[in-house]
């Protein structure tokens, strides 16, 4: 994979002379892609000498950071949030790139019995029987907790889910809490389950309980390093990187 990235970088350098000089690139990103982007940043930095200021968090956190006018060279966020930013003129026209889509899954501790998650009714019963459920603090406005609460409302079990709640700072933290035995189960984005040691996906949410979220990158109007940001995104979205996205839980946007 590192050889593939090196090959991609050769093309990037040919397309962008600006990428030849070391720079500091500030990236504000959704937690759903944290593990993937962190690994790619590490490889890219070693190859180019560029430094990165990498900040991640749930959707509500990102919305707040951007609303304060904080500088960023690159934003990676869910499609709905990108839509909001486009409407308010905060993004450079034509800079948006859809990176992939990711679904949600049920998290259990590695080695624990795998529960039935094959039908909506099975999900309802699992939520009712679980002793504790980890999820992002609703005040942070994360994608997963908003969907989980919609499902709980649909099943008529909101009070039960809330009482069992173990609050986390994000989907990956919810998966961590399950891995460390602080909660029996969690419902997280698949990309926030795969990289967590000690956590295992019992299965994806079934049928109409599933929520697919597209994540995209874009260059904000406040970017001080737009050329370097474009070069980095060119590397991330190259065909050579497709296996890395797939392994990380993402599917191509159709």
Task: List the predicted regions and their residue ranges.
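Bacterial N-terminal signal peptides
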Residues: 6-16
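Periplasmic-binding protein-like
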Residues: 73-76
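Exported/periplasmic ABC-transporter solute-binding proteins
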Residues: 23-68, 79-89, 95-102, 108-254
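Sec/Tat signal peptide C-region and signal peptidase I cleavage site
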Residues: 16-22
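Positively charged n-region of N-terminal signal peptides that target proteins for export
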Residues: 1-4
